[in-house]
Each structure stands twice: as C-alpha cells, then as structure tokens.
Curated annotation (Swiss-Prot):
This is Ephrin type-B receptor 4a. Residues 570-987 are cytoplasmic. Disruption phenotype: Morpholino knockdown of the protein results in marked vascular anomalies of the dorsal cranial vessels including both dorsal longitudinal and mesencephalic veins. Its EC number is 2.7.10.1. Receptor tyrosine kinase which binds promiscuously transmembrane ephrin-B family ligands residing on adjacent cells, leading to contact-dependent bidirectional signaling into neighboring cells. The signaling pathway downstream of the receptor is referred to as forward signaling while the signaling pathway downstream of the ephrin ligand is referred to as reverse signaling. Residues 621-884 form the Protein kinase domain.
Length: 987
C-alpha cells in the first residue's frame, strides 16, 4: 500500500511539473488597473475635445483610471501617449487593451466622419525625453502596431460589453518605449492598458535544471545544470541545453547527459536524484534504480555505492561490487592414501560447503615426522607432486621422492578465490602415513669435482640406510639440449659415491641423476642437477683463444672498412644501377624482387608504421556494424570515403581499451607488415587511424568472411575444380610471401578470407607468437593473448621453434585438407598432445570424402617429416595449374573418406619392392601409382630394372617433386638392392 501511495504521489508531481513547465510566465511592465493615482499621460489635439482622464469602476467594481474621448468630427487626430515603459530585456512585448466603443448609428453625428476604430503606435527611446512636441505627433517617427476595431459596440438600450484586444510589439532594442493611441472620429473609452512580456519559467526535467529564460528571438537557447547528486560523464561534457520559444513555452525535450551519481537513483520522473535507502545500493552512474544488496552483504547508510560483506564473507579482488559475498570452503572430506614404497597417491572428496564459489582448488602440505614426540617439519624440495602441490583442480595427487621407513603427515586444504582475504588459514584434513622400509633412500648432494672438455667427475652424499646395505649406484645423464630422447640419455654404474663420465661432448650441458640399489632393488632417482663440460681441453689454450679473438676482431674491422667503401661507391653511382635500389626500406634485389622488412628491426617501430601504412582521417570512415571480435578488440564493417575516390566498404579492426604500449605496437605491426604486400591473393591494407581513439586498421572488406566457416555453410556446394581454384589462389599468395622471405607462421583456413567472387586472400599477419611450455595441450600464444592450436603447425616448429617457408608448406597441406573436407576440424576431437604424438610416429590425415587422389598425395608431400623434402610454393602452384588444365584427373578419388572414426594413415613402413610382383603393384604400395604409365613408357617393366634408378633417372622421367623423389628412392634403398647410389634429391 505504501509503494502504491508513493507511485501515485510521484505521478501527480510529474504531471504538475509538466503542466507548469509548458505554461508561459508573464512579467508585467505596466498595468493601469493597479495605478492608485492619476496616470497623467500626454495628450495632443488640434481641436476639442481631447482625451480625458476619468475615474471609473472595473468589472469587479474596483476604482480604476481610464481615458475617454467622443469626437463629433473625424477630420482631426486626437493623440494619447503613455509614460516611458522599461522593456527589462524583452525583445517583444504584448499590449492588452480593455475598451468600449459607441456605435456610429447611435450617435448624432455625420456618419462619414464617424469611426469605430483607433490606431495603436509605439516609439522606442533610450532616455525619457518625450515632451509635448517631441516626438512629432504623426505616424513617423512612431511605429504603427495596428488599427484596432471593436468587436462589441455600445448602442442605446443595448448590452454593455467590453472589448479585449492583445497586440504584439517588437522587435524592441532600446531601453524603453512609449505607447500612443490615435482616435479619429471615434467615441470610445480606454478602460485599462496592460503591457507584459512572456518568458519560459524555471524548469526541472531529465535530471537537469534550467533557469527562467526570456526569449530574445524565435527560439532562445537556455543552458542548465545537473540536479543535486547528478553529473555528466566524461572529462569535459557539454552542459544541458533546452530551447525557449518566443511564446514563453519550452520547446521539445532537453539535450542532456545528466545521470545520478553512484548511490543515487532517479526519482519523481527524473526530477531529482534520491539516495539509495539502507539495504540498497547503486554501483555506477546512470538512470537505473537502486538494487538490493547481493547475498551476504549489507549497507549501513543511505546513498551507498557498494554493499559491505557481512562478517566472515569476502569478495575476491576480481569480483565486482554487484556480486554476492562468499566465504572460504570447508575442509576436504575423507582423504584416502595409497602407499607404494616411497610414493603415495592421495584422493579425497569435495568439501560439504564450497563457500558459494566455483573456483575451488586444493593444496597439499607435507610434513616429515622423523622421531616420535618431536614436531614434524616441512618436507624438503626432493618431494615431488603431480600435477602440482598447489592450485590442484582435481581431487587426486601423486607424491613421490619420500624417504623409506618414515612417517609423514599430509594435510589436504581446500581454497577458493576469497581464501586469501580470510584472516584464518584454509580448512584442511590431515592424514598420517608411513613409507616402506625396504626401499633405498634418495641420493642427495650431487656435485662436481672436476670437469674437462670431454668428461665430468661427480660425487654425492652416501645415504643413511639402516635396513639394507647399498650395493651399487646407477647414474643417468642426458644432453640438456636434446631433452629426454632415448638416444641422448646414458646410464652408468658405480660401486661408491663417485663417478667419472667420459666421452662427453665439448661445451655441452648435461642433466644428471643418481639412485641407489639394495637387496630390495633400485630406489627412485634423485633430483636432476645440471653440469657443463669445458669448451677447451685445459687452461693452456687461453693464449690461443686471445689470439683467435684478436684475429677475428681484425678481420671484422677490415670487413667494415671494405663495406663502407663499397657503400660510398654505390651511393655515388646509385642512379646508374637499376638492379639495386632502396625505396621506403624495401630492398629490391635483382629485377623487381621486393624483400620483406621486419618492422621490429626498426629502432622506433612507429617509424615502420609511418613508412608502410597510410594514415587516414577519421572523418573519412563511417562504422556501420560490428561483425566479429578478436584478441585485439572488435572487427567492424564500415565505409571509407576519401575525397576524389569512390566510396567502398572496408573491414575495420579496433584496438580494445586499456592496452599497453607494447600491445599497441604489436597491433600496428600487422599494418606495417600488410602495407608491404601488393598481391591479388593477399589482403589489401587501406590505411590506419592512430590520431584518435580507438586505434584502427582498415583493410578491404571480404564479403564471405573466413574460409573455414564459409565452407561449412556451403558444405558440398562447390565442385572439385572450384575448390582447386581456391587452393591455387592461396598457394599463389603464399608463393608471393615466400619470395619476399616472409614466414606467415599461422596459415589456416580461419585466416583465409573470401570475397564475393570466391577469391581467397591470406590475412592475419600478427607477430611475436611463443610456445606455452609445461602444458598438456601446448599452444602458440600471440602477443595480444590469443591462442593458436598447434595442429596446423609443422613438427620442427613445435619442437625447436624453427619457422620457415617449409613450415608454412606444412600448414598449407592442412589448409588443403580443410578445404577438401568443407571446413572439417583437422584431427577432429583428438587432443593437441595426441596430434603431436601421432605426427611423431609418422601418422597423417586420411583423404577427406570424395577427395581426388592427386590432391591427397600433394597433402602428404606437404607433410613430409623432413622439411627439405617438402615442395616449395612455386611447385604447388605449378602442380595445381596442371590439375586445372586437366580436370579429368580430379575424378580419381580415394576409396573411403575421412571421418572422426577413420584411422590416421600410417606412413612409417611403406611396402618395399620385394613384396610386390610388378612395377604397378610396387608404385601403388608406396602411393605413387600416378607414375605407373610413365615408368612403363620409359621401359621400366620389371622390378630388376627399377632397382637401378637414381635421381637423374627420375628427373628424366619428369618426377621433379622432391618428396616424390625421396619416397621412391627410399623404398628402393630400403632393401639394399640398389646397384648405383642415388644422387642427392634436387630441391
């Protein structure tokens, strides 16, 4: 009921405010009704009678001063002039006249000279200088307002009615004015004269207050201000504005951005900002209402912008003020240990109370209890945890590296996002276990005694072992740079706590571990320690090193001098040498071969942006709609209209707010890269906008968007020859990039854009990607934070970060597979780690459904493990051109298509000639059946003749792809039956 009453009251307040704001206010300048003494206006007449001032009664029987005149002859003018009336800033005023007029037919006078009208004039003046003769009693210098006619006339025996007329004067510009009345043959009485002007009253609307405003023109702009507890957003906002009409009424709605401050809500129809009551809050500025405090929070006063958490409840630093307060979780339940010698698997159940949060994690604290009765101490660094000791997401942890026959106390603690805010420690559940006495203890204290160029002498502490005598030590050492590959690790045994590792590589780092063996068997390896062999055999070689350094420095100085001389000579003759020129930092090698310039090689990366990208004025760009979002910000469609050029659509990448200087440089680096490329299959850079916020990159607009989603939307709608045409365009663009020595690093169908003519263009030239290590699902991460799945990346790029044009060729093979499968995800739902393992074991993607055999073989060529065996992009473009000229070859397809349940192709052990009876069988076994007719026409009709083939023979047969050459020669060489050693594969 109370809420209903408040709403009704608010309605009437709003209605009253609206009505008051829409009614004009009148300010009276003169009113003869209110005068209590004689008016003493000036009269002028050349003949009798004159205007006569008399006292009379108005309609309410109040005594008023009036003027009257009744002329018998209308040939002369009779004037009546008021005193000076101050205009008080008004540019136009209104004159309200109350008068009576006698009908001519009721008078005993000549009808032709009798009139039933009179004239109204005014005269402006800055001083009150009017006299009996000045200004002259004539129409000029007076300004005529109107000839006033009576609506009601007095006649004998008739009803007495008063005429009321309101006339407008203006425009007025001087200090004041005089009113003048001219009667010519009229019989009338001027009962009252009221002079006033209209003004817009003070108004409150849309949380803005506007002052009383006098209109000085057709519309007068009024500047207001926000109501109390309201403000406008932004550093320098424009004040509220509204227009006052000449009729004294406000025109339309105000132009304002006033909103209530945090802790206040709009009330009474946006007439005021009212403080939020206790128990309610409003966290930001705006016209929205106050909200009830989130769960477990409260306010202690009115006008609160945030609710304070109740005792025992907290908010994480990342939580916003409108989220509920939460508390730390209760302890994990029922920890269950599984002890295996000196290792432990610990599992537990989740807490009964998660604290109201979903970011639950666990930590494990380990304490070793050496002797009964003494306090337990924290475990040493030799204890290992999987997946980790802290931040565990699951409810299971494996622990190893424990000492045998030792009691440990493990505490499993539950934490969430507000555990750090709590003054109490995390709740935990403790369990005690004792390890087996039969396992040797860990070996510790491994250190180096001496080191040479090819050996390391190491020793370690003898473990304290009371149960079994240590029989032997085993040493495991691996080259650090080669990781834990089986062929890089070696083992040695030692009967004492010292060992000499010999036959080591010079200046190489080794990772060494030691474990002990007793009658109970081997224990666990101790902590891995790194040691490095020396670069020289002994210290006596130091003089040779110094001599070598001096020689190298001398040669370097000589090279610098020669280079400077060559530079000066070429600079003098530069106009004569068309083969080598330098323009805008892009070096032309030979005849028109442009080389890509890395923008990060500039001392100031902004210089590269200015050099390769054109700055566009923001007024030339109109953003129409948001079409996507990326790691940098939003992607929009817009129009670009440059004076003198045709308007066209563009794609606009914007940099999201809150960026760092490095993120801005990385964002604009893509523009300085794109600006160097001019090719029909490379996305074209229109320009950049850096002079205003947000920073933008403008490129040509591609109507069909990304290739992968476009293919999925049009699954099965394109013929093989159309798909080959798309692939040919992508390969042509990549050929152009490779010729400029640019490595893309992220070639995938999602980064290929398609226009309305199905032309495919390579895009996304972001840089600075690095590999996230120590992850079960490794991904490349760009500098702006976006993750790139590695299933498009060549194995050498994953393992050694070796990005080359050959690694781009591998990625192109994956793009081919995406195109022929109409946007299928490569390797389907396999994890990234499974993909890495499969590729390392020489498994490859099978052909997509209805994929031409020739195209799948080209994919396999791109996926050669040895990067030097992969075709170049020039070879790929040539091969696809042949397919387009001979579309019949596209009709030969694989027997079965790929799918999530289809196994990967095993490329590890191709069939050898010995298992095949004919040349055709052998070629089909190694997936080279396309060359069967070529072999037979050249006379290779038996396997005996095939075994004599070498590289030169393959070239004569027209087999030029390096991958095909290697596969054929490797199959022959595998049996050791080749009489002539094959030549090197030609690249």
């Amino acid at each position: 009921m109370e809420l209903f009453s408040r709403n009704v009251a608010a309605f009437w307040i709003i209605l009253l405010e609206f009505l008051l704001g829409s009614v004009a206010e009148e300010e009276v300048l003169m009113n003869t009704k209110t005068e209590t003494s004689d008016l003493k206006w000036t009269t002028h007449s050349r003949s009798k009678p004159e205007w006569e001032e008399v006292s009379g009664l108005d309609e309410e029987n109040n005594s008023v001063r009036t003027y009257q005149i009744c002329q018998a002859d209308g040939s002369s003018s009779h004037w009546l002039r008021s005193k000076l009336i101050e205009r008080r800033g008004a540019s136009q005023v209104y004159v309200e006249l109350f008068f009576t007029m006698v009908e001519c037919s009721s008078r005993n006078t000549h009808h032709r000279s009798c009139k039933e009208t009179f004239n109204l004039y005014y005269y402006q003046s800055d001083t009150d200088d009017a006299t009996a003769t000045h200004p002259a009693w004539m129409e000029n210098p007076y300004t005529k307002v109107d000839t006033v006619a009576a609506d009601f006339l007095l006649r004998k025996g008739g009803e007495k009615k008063v005429n009321v007329k309101t006339l407008r004067l203006g425009p007025l510009s001087k200090r004041g004015f005089y009113l003048a009345f001219q009667a010519q043959g009229a019989c009338m009485a001027l009962l009252s004269v009221r002079v006033f002007f209209k003004k817009c009253p003070a108004l409150t609307r849309s949380l803005s207050v506007f002052p009383e405003t006098v209109p000085r023109s057709l519309v007068q702009e009024a500047v207001g201000q926000c109501v109390a507890n309201a403000a406008q957003p932004g550093p320098s906002p424009r004040p509220p504005k509204m227009f006052c009409g000449e009729d004294g009424q406000w025109v339309d709605q105000p132009t304002t951005t006033c909103t209530c401050l945090p802790g206040f809500e709009a009330s009474h129809g946006e007439l005021e900002c009212r403080a939020c009551p206790v128990g309610l809050f409003k966290m930001g500025s705006g016209t929205g209402p106050c909200s009830v405090c989130p769960e477990n929070s409260q306010t202690g006063e009115t006008g609160s912008a945030a609710c304070v958490c109740r005792s025992g409840f907290y908010r994480a630093l990342s939580d916003s003020a409108d989220t509920p307060c939460t508390r730390p979780p209760s302890s994990p339940r029922s920890p269950v240990p599984q002890v295996n010698d000196t290792s432990l698997t610990l599992e537990w159940s989740e807490p009964l109370d998660s604290g109201g949060r979903s970011d639950l994690s666990y930590s494990v604290e380990c304490r070793m209890c050496s002797t009964p009765g003494s306090p337990c101490t924290l475990c040493s660094d030799g204890v290992n945890y999987r997946p980790s000791q802290t931040g565990i997401q699951g409810r299971r942890v494996s622990i190893w590296g424990l000492r045998p026959h030792t009691t440990y106390s493990f505490t499993v603690m539950a934490l969430n996002g507000v555990s750090a805010q709590s003054q109490q420690g995390p709740a935990g559940e403790t369990i005690n276990i004792t390890t087996s006495p039969n396992v040797p203890v860990l070996v510790s204290g491994l250190r180096k005694s001496t080191a040479t160029e090819s050996s390391l002498t190491l020793y370690w502490n003898t473990p304290t072992q009371s149960h079994y005598r240590i029989l032997q030590y085993q040493i495991r050492y691996c080259e650090k740079e080669r990781g834990s590959e089986e062929n890089s690790c070696h083992y040695m045994e030692s009967n004492n706590n010292e060992v000499v590792l010999s036959d080591l590589r010079r200046a190489t780092q080794y990772e060494v571990q030691v474990r002990a063996r007793t009658f109970a068997g081997y224990g666990s390896f101790g902590k891995a320690i790194l040691f490095r062999t020396l670069p020289d055999e002994d210290d006596s070689s130091s003089p040779l090193l110094v001599t070598g350094i001096l020689i190298a420095m001398g040669m370097l100085l000589l090279i610098i001098v020669i280079g400077a001389a060559i530079y000066c000579i070429r600079k003098q003759n530069n106009y004569k040498d068309p083969e080598l020129s330098d323009k805008n930092g892009q070096y032309l090698m030979g005849q028109g071969v442009k080389v890509y310039i890395d923008p990060f090689t500039y001392e100031d990366p902004n210089e590269a942006v200015r050099e390769f990208a054109k700055e566009i004025d923001v007024s030339c760009v109109k953003i129409e709609e948001v079409i996507g979002a990326g790691e940098f910000g939003e992607v929009c469609r817009g129009r670009l209209r440059i004076p003198g050029k045709k308007e066209n659509y563009v794609a606009i990448k914007t940099l999201k707010g809150g960026y760092t200087d490095k993120q801005r440089r990385d964002f604009l680096a893509e523009a300085s890269i794109m600006g160097q490329f001019q090719h029909p299959n490379i996305i074209h850079l229109e320009g950049i906008i850096t002079a205003s916020c947000p920073v933008m990159i403008l490129t040509e607009f591609m109507e069909n968007g990304a290739l992968d989603s476009f293919l999925r939307l049009n699954d099965g709608q394109f013929t093989p020859i159309q798909l080959v045409g798309m692939l040919r365009g992508i390969a042509s663009g990549m050929k152009y990039l490779s010729e400029m020595s640019y490595v893309h690093r992220d070639l995938a169908a999602r980064n290929i854009l398609v226009n309305s003519n199905l032309v495919c263009k390579v895009s996304d030239f972001g840089l600075s990607r690095f590999l996230q290590e120590n992850s079960s699902d490794p991904t490349y991460t760009s500098s702006l934070g976006g993750k790139i799945p590695i299933r498009w990346t060549a194995p050498e790029a994953i393992a050694f970060r070796k990005f080359t044009c050959a690694s781009d060729v591998w990625s192109y093979g994956i793009v081919m597979w995406e195109v022929m499968s109409f946007g299928e995800r490569p390797y389907w739902d396999m994890s990234n780690q499974d993909v890495i393992n499969a590729i390392e074991q020489d498994y490859r993607l099978p052909p997509p459904p209805d994929c031409p055999t020739y195209l799948h073989q080209l994919m396999l060529d791109c996926w050669q493990k040895e990067r030097t065996a992969r075709p170049r992009f020039a070879n790929i473009v040539s091969a696809l051109d042949k397919l387009i000229r001979n579309p019949a070859s596209l009709k030969i397809t694989a027997q079965e298509g790929a799918g999530p349940s289809h196994p990967l192709l095993d490329q590890r052990s191709p069939l050898t000639p010995s298992s095949c009876g004919t040349v055709g069988d052998w070629l089909r076994a190694i997936k080279m059946e396309r060359y069967e007719e070529t072999f037979l026409q050249a006379g290779y009709t038996s396997m005996q003749l095939v075994t004599h083939i070498n590289t030169e023979d393959l070239l004569r047969l027209g087999i030029t792809l390096a991958g095909h050459q290697k596969k054929i020669l490797s199959s022959i060489e595998a049996l050791g039956i080749q009489n002539k050693a094959p030549g090197n594969v030609l690249y």
